[in-house]
């Protein structure tokens, strides 16, 4: 039987390190590498593509890591790159000039252990008659004999030691559990890497910003923030992402399916983690706690923003005025003050606003919506700040005090206007007569004097007043007399 030209060998799927690269891996990562290589090796055996399986299998099981022999290097033809010498051997049948001994010697010369610069095929033969085991594996390949059969998938295997692997894959067995959080893993080496999260070990540091990570994969993903690399592209909209998981989450947006429903309010979500975050609103759970002031938050991102308050760092600042902000979003909002940009327009009256939240509040003027209601008197307000200010009328709270005369006020704007009396500041000017005034409302009254307008009318006597306040005073006096 002639071997297929498309036959996959262990070298085709193996991840081979140089000695320098292997030195960058810690013990847990080496074990994980060994486990993955071992599984790839077993999978190849299950389809009968690898004849010299036993010794490679034993060396992987003994955690003796392999790497490409770079002792002999040659100058590459393109770009002058140094490339490791790679030996290839023809895909020939057993009667075309390549014996089992020759194949084994070629493999032994191509792969070497980290502590040896070269390795001889005789070193393999000394360990438990490995050559006879190779010949046994090759003879099985020649004859096609596969004595072990799986009862579930009817797949045949040439080695009983490999027979259990497909069953393990089908059952997705995760026998190694974390004592801290209960998360399970297929490999104990993967568990060891996971446990760094609980131990706080962060062995991998970014050279650009100094941020540390518990896994090298997380560092590689983070470095794309600095390089701008987004290798994972959405086929529908072309949007790029730094990590595959973000692309997977994004693709569900195109599907539009919302399978996760909140039992409390009925709101639907695309992802289960979005539902979990939302449910904290109903349960009041705040699992993320500040270690400095013990304030708790529903989201980790909220905690991260809060922690910057303690450090005093404001990494986002305006180049013109130097004002700093904790979040870049706040910086972008602030910059609209300098640019004068007001991109949000009201369709009813055409008024423009810098922020979408301002537009939403303004639209309540047209709709008449007043969602904030006082529990004591039933009066409603458009904004929450308006309701909070109204509450002070019931409580009598006046938190803003004048340092000059001691007079108290319910709101900050009132004390600012009051202080102009002490400093004799009159920032408002009548456009008709040029008279300077303390308050903006006084300027409006002055303009009414020039125009003769008296908009406030008493319904009982018909008398008109320039200011609504004057009418209210007259009415209160009349009611007291009666």
From Swiss-Prot:
Pfam families: KRAB, zf-C2H2. Its main location: nucleus. It comes from the Eukaryota. A zinc finger (C2H2-type) spans 176-198, 204-226, 232-254, 260-282, 288-310, 316-338, 344-366, 372-394, 400-422, 428-450. InterPro entries: KRAB, KRAB_dom_sf, Znf_C2H2_sf, Znf_C2H2_type. Keywords: DNA-binding, Metal-binding, Nucleus, Repeat, Transcription, Transcription regulation, Zinc, Zinc-finger. One of its GO terms (molecular function) is DNA binding. Belongs to the krueppel C2H2-type zinc-finger protein family. This is Zinc finger protein 223. The lineage of its organism: Eukaryota, Metazoa, Chordata, Craniata, Vertebrata. The gene is ZNF223.
């Amino acid at each position: 039987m002639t071997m297929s030209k498309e036959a996959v060998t262990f070298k085709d799927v193996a991840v081979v390190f140089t000695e320098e690269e292997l030195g960058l891996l810690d013990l847990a990562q080496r074990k994980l590498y060994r486990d993955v290589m071992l599984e790839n090796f077993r999978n190849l055996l299950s389809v009968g593509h690898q004849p010299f399986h036993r010794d490679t299998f034993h060396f992987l099981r003994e955690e003796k890591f392999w790497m490409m022999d770079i002792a002999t290097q040659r100058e590459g033809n393109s770009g002058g790159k140094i490339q490791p010498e790679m030996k290839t051997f023809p895909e020939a049948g057993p009667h075309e000039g390549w014996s089992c001994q020759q194949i084994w010697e070629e493999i032994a010369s191509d792969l070497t252990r980290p502590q040896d610069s070269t390795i001889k095929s005789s070193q393999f033969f000394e360990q438990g008659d490995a050559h006879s085991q190779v010949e046994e594996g090759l003879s099985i390949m020649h004859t096609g004999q596969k004595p072990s059969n799986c009862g579930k998938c009817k797949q045949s295997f040439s080695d009983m030691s490999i027979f259990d692997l497909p069953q393990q894959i089908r059952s997705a067995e995760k026998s190694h559990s974390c004592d801290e959080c209960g998360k399970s893993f297929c490999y104990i080496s993967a568990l060891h890497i996971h446990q760094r999260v609980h131990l706080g070990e962060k062995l991998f540091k970014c050279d650009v910003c100094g941020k540390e990570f518990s896994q090298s994969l997380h560092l590689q993903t983070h470095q794309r923030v600095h390089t701008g690399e987004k290798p994972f592209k959405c086929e529908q909209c072309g949007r790029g992402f730094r990590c595959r998981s973000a692309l997977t989450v994004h693709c569900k947006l195109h599907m539009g399916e919302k399978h996760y429903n909140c039992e409390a309010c009925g709101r639907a979500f695309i992802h289960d983690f979005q539902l979990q975050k939302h449910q904290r609103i109903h349960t009041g759970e705040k699992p993320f706690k500040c270690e400095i002031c013990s304030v708790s938050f529903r989201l980790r991102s909220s905690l991260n923003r809060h922690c910057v308050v303690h450090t005093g760092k404001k990494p986002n600042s305006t180049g013109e005025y130097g004002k700093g902000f904790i979040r870049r979003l706040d910086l972008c909002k602030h910059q609209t003050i300098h640019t004068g940009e007001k991109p949000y327009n009201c369709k009813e009256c055409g008024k423009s606003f810098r922020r979408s939240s301002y537009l939403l509040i303004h639209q309540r003027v047209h709709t008449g919506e007043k969602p904030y209601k006082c529990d004591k008197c039933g009066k409603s307000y458009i904004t929450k700040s308006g309701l909070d200010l109204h509450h002070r009328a019931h409580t009598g709270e006046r938190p803003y005090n004048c340092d000059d005369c001691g007079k108290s006020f319910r709101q900050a704007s009132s004390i600012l206007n009051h202080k102009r009396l002490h400093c004799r500041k009159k920032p408002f000017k009548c456009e008709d007569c040029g008279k300077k005034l303390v308050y903006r409302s006084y300027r409006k009254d002055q303009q009414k004097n020039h125009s003769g307008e008296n908009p406030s009318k008493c319904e009982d006597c018909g008398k008109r007043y320039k200011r609504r306040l004057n009418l209210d005073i007259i009415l209160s006096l009349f009611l007291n007399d009666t």
